[in-house]
């Protein structure tokens, strides 16, 4: 899922995410977006035109809290010094997957993301967005090859493999296969078989002790 970052308190959100990362054994990823429904922002008292800038600044503020012993950040929307936030995630960061279909989202993924998730788009649109991600990452001094591209596959089962191969050529590494009214019958048996198989081999992981996390 995608969390609408500019609607949250970044200091509290940073602590929540770091805690989830610890409890999950570093399996937690934070999916972020800027939001699309202006009425939500009006109800929360968050200025709609500022949502992109807020998201960028909140990402930077959270990175400071995750990586610095006594964090300091001074921005337009967030300002703190000597802030202590515990626990801190392994490696000083929580993986961030940026959702969106715009150039702004792609640039954000290049600057802050470990992943980029445009849920849909034509081949031409996806190719353009992935190029924007790589260019933005390079400009930010980051490795563009370390950013994983994800998208959805809406095709029926018989067409899925062909579509996956096409997307792989575009630069997609991870796929979410959507089951909807158009392909539910074709996908149900396969999904059920995989769930039965998973049930037979799954072992509950439990929760690690704090000093082991």
Where do the language-model regions lie?
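Active-site-adjacent structural elements that line small-molecule/cofactor binding pockets in enzymes
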Residues: 1-213
């Amino acid at each position: 899922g995608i969390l609408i970052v500019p609607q949250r308190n970044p200091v509290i959100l940073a602590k929540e995410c770091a805690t989830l990362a610890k409890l999950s054994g570093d399996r937690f990823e934070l999916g972020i977006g800027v939001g699309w429904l202006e009425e939500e922002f009006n109800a929360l008292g968050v200025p709609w035109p500022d949502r992109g800038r807020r998201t960028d600044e909140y990402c930077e503020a959270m990175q400071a809290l995750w990586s610095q012993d006594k964090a300091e950040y001074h921005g337009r929307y967030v300002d703190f010094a000597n802030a202590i936030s515990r626990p801190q995630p392994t490696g000083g960061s929580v993986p961030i997957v940026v959702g969106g279909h715009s150039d702004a989202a792609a640039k954000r993924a290049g600057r802050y993301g470990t992943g980029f998730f445009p849920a849909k788009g034509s081949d031409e649109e996806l190719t353009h967005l992935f190029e924007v991600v790589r260019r933005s990452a390079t400009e930010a001094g980051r490795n563009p090859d370390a950013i994983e591209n994800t998208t959805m596959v809406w095709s029926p089962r018989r067409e899925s493999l062909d579509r996956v191969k096409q997307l792989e050529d575009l630069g997609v590494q991870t796929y979410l296969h959507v089951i909807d009214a158009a392909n539910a019958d074709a996908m149900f048996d396969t999904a059920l078989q995989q769930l039965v198989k998973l049930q037979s081999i799954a072992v509950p992981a439990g929760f690690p002790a704090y000093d082991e996390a």
